[in-house]
Regions:
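Pan-zinc metallopeptidase signature
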Residues: 2-39, 169-196
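Short extracytoplasmic/periplasmic juxtamembrane "stem" segments immediately C-terminal to an N-terminal membrane anchor
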Residues: 38-60
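Stable alpha-helical elements in mature extracytoplasmic
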Residues: 61-68, 120, 124, 149-153, ...
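Active-site recognition of the HExxH zinc-binding catalytic motif
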Residues: 122-135, 154-155
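Catalytic toxin/effector domains delivered as secreted proteins or via bacterial secretion systems
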Residues: 135, 139, 166-167
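Post-HExxH zinc-binding segment in Zn-dependent metallohydrolases
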Residues: 143-179
């Protein structure tokens, strides 16, 4: 009996160590996941769900967050819970979160990141739409739904002011607009359930 418990404890310990290593590796190599720990990172100053690397930028970040949140909710419904958003005003902060060339990035429904060039309402609304998509469809479905639906919806409903987007985003925005006109359901999430 003692030997049996010893084996169970060893297996449990191996599983725990494996999971701990997996979490550590994910945290190191997939930098955007760090948004989960935004409130605990010393380089950030958080007020509610808005985190900034420079405290002087907090008022502007809060204004952008609140405006984009309201606009997004008007277009795609209320959030299940208000997302955490990290606003980086320096390239160093953006690099900490693995932003690379992105202006902003939604990390599923875990949080959002905004790089220095992304401090514009349409970028933030675009990423909040992705956050809502992840809330409604799930994080895995964000990878399996058609790109024209995922990206087209975000570009179209965020009122991105650029008349022409790069390939393939321009086509995806146009395809979504056409689909949306043909499927005028007041509950956009109900309408998108049918799209595979």
């Amino acid at each position: 009996v003692k030997n049996q418990y010893s084996k169970i404890i060893k297996i449990g310990l191996y599983i725990f160590i494996t999971l701990a290593i997996l979490v550590l590796v994910t945290f190191i190599w997939f930098k955007p996941i760090r948004v989960i720990f935004a409130h605990h990172l010393s380089l950030l100053h958080c007020d509610g769900q808005v985190c900034v690397d420079d405290p002087k930028t907090q008022p502007l970040a809060k204004t952008l967050y609140n405006q984009a949140l309201k606009e997004t909710q008007n277009k795609v419904g209320a959030f299940h819970q208000q997302p955490t958003m990290v606003f980086c005003s320096t390239p160093q902060c953006a690099n900490t979160f693995g932003m690379e060339k992105a202006a902003a990035k939604a990390v599923g429904n875990l949080g959002l990141l905004v790089a220095p060039r992304g401090w514009k309402d349409f970028y933030i609304t675009h990423e909040l739409i992705h956050h809502r998509q992840a809330e409604e469809w799930g994080n895995i479905a964000m990878l399996t739904k058609p790109k024209w639906l995922v990206e087209g919806m975000a570009y179209s409903l965020s009122d991105d002011p650029r008349p022409t987007l790069s390939v393939p985003f321009q086509q995806w925005r146009a395809q979504f607009k056409l689909w949306h006109q043909q499927n005028p359901d007041s509950n956009i999430w109900h309408a998108t359930e049918k799209v595979k």
